[in-house]
Protein backbone atom coordinates (compact mmCIF):
# COMPACT_ATOMS: atom_id res chain seq x y z
CA UNK A 1 0.00 0.00 0.00
CA UNK A 2 1.05 3.56 -0.66
CA UNK A 3 1.98 5.94 2.16
CA UNK A 4 4.51 8.76 2.61
CA UNK A 5 8.00 7.92 3.90
CA UNK A 6 7.89 10.83 6.32
CA UNK A 7 5.55 13.74 6.92
CA UNK A 8 5.95 17.15 8.47
CA UNK A 9 2.73 16.85 10.52
CA UNK A 10 1.26 13.57 11.84
CA UNK A 11 -2.30 14.92 12.01
CA UNK A 12 -3.95 17.28 9.54
CA UNK A 13 -7.35 18.98 9.36
CA UNK A 14 -9.99 17.38 7.17
CA UNK A 15 -10.47 20.24 4.71
CA UNK A 16 -13.23 20.56 2.09
CA UNK A 17 -13.72 19.02 -1.33
CA UNK A 18 -14.86 21.91 -3.49
CA UNK A 19 -14.10 22.93 -7.05
CA UNK A 20 -12.46 21.07 -9.90
CA UNK A 21 -9.00 19.55 -10.10
CA UNK A 22 -6.36 22.23 -10.61
CA UNK A 23 -3.78 19.97 -12.26
CA UNK A 24 -3.33 16.40 -13.43
CA UNK A 25 -6.41 16.50 -15.63
CA UNK A 26 -4.84 15.35 -18.90
CA UNK A 27 -3.38 12.02 -19.99
CA UNK A 28 0.37 12.63 -19.73
CA UNK A 29 2.21 9.28 -19.71
CA UNK A 30 0.00 6.58 -21.26
CA UNK A 31 -2.53 6.33 -24.08
CA UNK A 32 -5.66 5.90 -21.95
CA UNK A 33 -6.74 7.27 -18.59
CA UNK A 34 -9.35 6.94 -15.84
CA UNK A 35 -10.83 10.35 -14.99
CA UNK A 36 -12.73 11.15 -11.77
CA UNK A 37 -16.17 12.72 -12.20
CA UNK A 38 -16.81 13.29 -8.48
CA UNK A 39 -14.83 14.51 -5.48
CA UNK A 40 -13.78 12.00 -2.82
CA UNK A 41 -11.07 10.67 -0.58
CA UNK A 42 -9.53 7.58 -2.20
CA UNK A 43 -7.80 5.36 0.36
CA UNK A 44 -4.48 3.64 -0.28
CA UNK A 45 -6.30 0.27 -0.12
CA UNK A 46 -8.73 1.33 -2.87
CA UNK A 47 -5.85 2.51 -5.07
CA UNK A 48 -4.07 -0.81 -4.56
CA UNK A 49 -7.23 -2.83 -5.27
CA UNK A 50 -7.80 -0.91 -8.53
CA UNK A 51 -4.15 -1.37 -9.54
CA UNK A 52 -4.30 -5.13 -8.93
CA UNK A 53 -7.59 -5.44 -10.87
CA UNK A 54 -6.05 -3.65 -13.89
CA UNK A 55 -2.70 -5.46 -13.88
CA UNK A 56 -4.34 -8.89 -13.52
CA UNK A 57 -6.58 -8.20 -16.52
CA UNK A 58 -3.85 -6.90 -18.84
CA UNK A 59 -1.51 -9.69 -17.63
CA UNK A 60 2.06 -9.06 -18.80
CA UNK A 61 1.29 -6.57 -21.57
CA UNK A 62 1.07 -2.84 -21.07
CA UNK A 63 2.14 -0.43 -18.36
CA UNK A 64 0.06 1.16 -15.58
CA UNK A 65 0.73 4.58 -14.04
CA UNK A 66 -0.86 5.63 -10.74
CA UNK A 67 -1.26 9.42 -10.87
CA UNK A 68 -2.61 9.96 -7.34
CA UNK A 69 -0.79 9.48 -4.05
CA UNK A 70 -2.35 9.13 -0.57
CA UNK A 71 -0.59 11.85 1.41
CA UNK A 72 -3.37 12.86 3.83
CA UNK A 73 -3.54 10.99 7.17
CA UNK A 74 -7.02 10.25 8.52
CA UNK A 75 -7.27 9.85 12.28
CA UNK A 76 -9.71 7.77 14.30
CA UNK A 77 -10.31 7.33 18.00
CA UNK A 78 -10.73 3.84 19.50
CA UNK A 79 -14.24 2.38 19.82
CA UNK A 80 -16.22 3.24 22.98
CA UNK A 81 -14.00 6.20 23.85
CA UNK A 82 -15.45 9.33 25.45
CA UNK A 83 -15.34 12.62 23.61
CA UNK A 84 -12.38 14.91 24.18
CA UNK A 85 -8.86 13.96 25.28
CA UNK A 86 -7.27 14.99 22.01
CA UNK A 87 -7.32 13.98 18.38
CA UNK A 88 -7.12 10.28 17.51
CA UNK A 89 -4.10 8.54 16.07
CA UNK A 90 -3.58 8.21 12.28
CA UNK A 91 -5.42 5.11 10.99
CA UNK A 92 -5.06 5.23 7.20
CA UNK A 93 -4.00 7.46 4.30
CA UNK A 94 -6.12 9.02 1.56
CA UNK A 95 -5.58 10.87 -1.71
CA UNK A 96 -7.82 13.92 -2.18
CA UNK A 97 -9.39 13.58 -5.64
CA UNK A 98 -11.47 16.31 -7.27
CA UNK A 99 -13.53 16.11 -10.50
CA UNK A 100 -11.42 16.05 -13.66
CA UNK A 101 -8.39 14.35 -12.10
CA UNK A 102 -6.75 11.52 -14.08
CA UNK A 103 -6.16 8.79 -11.49
CA UNK A 104 -4.70 5.96 -13.58
CA UNK A 105 -3.06 5.76 -16.99
CA UNK A 106 -2.46 2.77 -19.23
CA UNK A 107 -0.35 2.15 -22.35
CA UNK A 108 0.79 -0.71 -24.54
CA UNK A 109 -2.57 -2.50 -24.87
CA UNK A 110 -5.44 -2.35 -27.41
CA UNK A 111 -8.30 0.06 -26.66
CA UNK A 112 -10.89 -2.63 -25.86
CA UNK A 113 -8.49 -4.28 -23.38
CA UNK A 114 -7.76 -0.89 -21.78
CA UNK A 115 -11.51 -0.12 -21.52
CA UNK A 116 -12.22 -3.41 -19.76
CA UNK A 117 -9.23 -3.02 -17.41
CA UNK A 118 -10.40 0.49 -16.47
CA UNK A 119 -13.98 -0.78 -15.99
CA UNK A 120 -12.69 -3.36 -13.50
CA UNK A 121 -10.73 -0.63 -11.70
CA UNK A 122 -13.83 1.62 -11.57
CA UNK A 123 -15.67 -1.02 -9.55
CA UNK A 124 -12.98 -0.82 -6.86
CA UNK A 125 -13.34 2.96 -6.47
CA UNK A 126 -16.08 4.81 -4.52
CA UNK A 127 -16.70 7.47 -7.21
CA UNK A 128 -18.02 7.76 -10.76
CA UNK A 129 -15.22 7.75 -13.35
CA UNK A 130 -14.89 7.81 -17.10
CA UNK A 131 -12.50 6.28 -19.62
CA UNK A 132 -10.53 8.90 -21.58
CA UNK A 133 -8.06 8.75 -24.45
CA UNK A 134 -4.95 10.85 -24.97
CA UNK A 135 -5.66 14.02 -26.96
CA UNK A 136 -3.73 14.66 -30.12
CA UNK A 137 -1.30 17.60 -30.05
CA UNK A 138 -3.43 19.54 -32.55
CA UNK A 139 -6.58 19.00 -30.47
CA UNK A 140 -5.06 20.59 -27.38
CA UNK A 141 -3.93 23.70 -29.27
CA UNK A 142 -7.46 24.32 -30.60
CA UNK A 143 -9.02 24.31 -27.11
CA UNK A 144 -7.30 27.49 -25.92
Swiss-Prot record:
GO biological process terms held by the UniProt record: translation
Name of one Pfam family that matches: Ribosomal_L16
GO molecular function: rRNA binding; structural constituent of ribosome; tRNA binding
Entry-linked PROSITE patterns: RIBOSOMAL_L16_1, RIBOSOMAL_L16_2
UniProt keyword annotations, A-Z: Ribonucleoprotein, Ribosomal protein, RNA-binding, rRNA-binding, tRNA-binding
Entry keyword annotation includes tRNA-binding: yes
Record bears the keyword Kinase: no
GO CC, alphabetical: cytosolic large ribosomal subunit
Entry-linked Gene3D superfamilies: Ribosomal protein L10e/L16 (3.90.1170.10)
Superkingdom assignment: Bacteria
Subunit description: Part of the 50S ribosomal subunit.
Function text: Binds 23S rRNA and is also seen to make contacts with the A and possibly P site tRNAs.
Family (UniProt): Belongs to the universal ribosomal protein uL16 family.
UniProt-recorded name of the protein: Large ribosomal subunit protein uL16
Species of the source: Heliobacterium modesticaldum (strain ATCC 51547 / Ice1)
Amino acid sequence: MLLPKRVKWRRVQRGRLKGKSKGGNSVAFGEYGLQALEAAWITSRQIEAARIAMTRYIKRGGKVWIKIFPDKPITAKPAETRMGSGKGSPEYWVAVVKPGRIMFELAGVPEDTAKEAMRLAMHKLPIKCKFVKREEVGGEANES
